[in-house]
Amino acid sequence: MTDDNPAIVIDNGSGMCKAGFAGDDAPRAVFPTVVGRPKRETVLVGSTHKEEYIGDEALAKRGVLKLSYPIEHGQIKDWDMMEKVWHHCYFNELRAQPSDHAVLLTEAPKNPKANREKICQIMFETFAVPAFYVQVQAVLALYSSGRTTGIVIDTGDGVTHTVPVYEGYSLPHAVLRSEIAGKELTDFCQINLQENGASFTTSAEFEIVRDIKEKLCFVALDYESVLAASMESANYTKTYELPDGVVITVNQARFKTPELLFRPELNNSDMDGIHQLCYKTIQKCDIDIRSELYSNVVLSGGSSMFAGLPERLEKELLDLIPAGKRVRISSPEDRKYSAWVGGSVLGSLATFESMWVSSQEYQENGASIANRKCM
């Protein structure tokens, strides 16, 4: 793609959509992956009537809208709504004509082939893009860290994956997933805050809980000792001012919330913690590459942003693996945008030109071309 018409990169997340132009350092648009439709025809009289509200606008009007999230646990579930998100992305956020730009989209690991073909079909037939590519989010996150081999722990809003990548290719047989991710953590934070006397029940208040989670929570290196210390002193207590001016104190919820990533049983789940997922994924890989994977553990996604997470993960992995093995955790500062940044790098490479699925190839081969060319 030329500098005048750089490729557009869209990272489709369960919680947030990130979009921008290949070659840029960061996405230009970041907005919630949510579509709202008026509950009743008469509710929004006096305002400019719209059939749908998308992203932040939908959340701002959530009281009179029925919200739908087209991506659940990493998979597109509502294609009509997803089209509307992409339309909003092109015309409202980026103000770009789809027909002028190739598009590189991200997908979750093990995305069904039919889903990939559907994305390809929509991009060529609805948006008339000149060229298309789709790549696994974790692979792009690894690229953004300057690596082509490693294991990515990608934990976003809807799903967590451990994805081994060897020389640029993901190894699907070893990919593991957990539904313990951002939304689950926010739910768990809400439970912990309620136990402390704070009540959050509406969807608007859920957003407040999410903000508390993101601003105040941290991962304890030694959970039991921090739990004991929090009962003896106020060292772990922080205050948070609610929108109405009321100030609440937040204590154990600060470290109990992200502890769920390591101990899902705290919320009655029998899923593995992220350290166990990482270990099991590497054990599924060829013995000859395991040491290299342990030396290149890359964190990615918004739910990996907790302070203390890299240190705790290293400690837990060292307890699981044979003595003498080395573990190295990479936690880039911009890791909540890692997949998008990797797509930006890939989409701007001259050597990538031959990888795009062109509109001519689509016309000749149909949507199945996406599964042959997008590896």
From Swiss-Prot:
TM regions (residue ranges): none
SMART domains: ACTIN
Localization, UniProt: Cytoplasm, Cytoskeleton
EC number, as in UniProt: 3.6.4.-
Keywords: ATP-binding, Cytoplasm, Cytoskeleton, Hydrolase, Nucleotide-binding
Keyword NAD among UniProt keywords: no
GO MF, one annotated term: hydrolase activity
Keyword Cytoplasm tagged: yes
Catalysis: reaction(s): ATP + H2O = ADP + phosphate + H(+)
PROSITE patterns in alphabetical order: ACTINS_1, ACTINS_ACT_LIKE
Any one of the GO CC terms: cytoplasm
Family membership noted in the UniProt record: Belongs to the actin family.
Function according to Swiss-Prot or TrEMBL: Actins are highly conserved proteins that are involved in various types of cell motility and are ubiquitously expressed in all eukaryotic cells.
Protein name: Actin
Species, as recorded: Giardia intestinalis
Lineage, highest ranks first: Eukaryota, Metamonada, Diplomonadida, Hexamitidae, Giardiinae
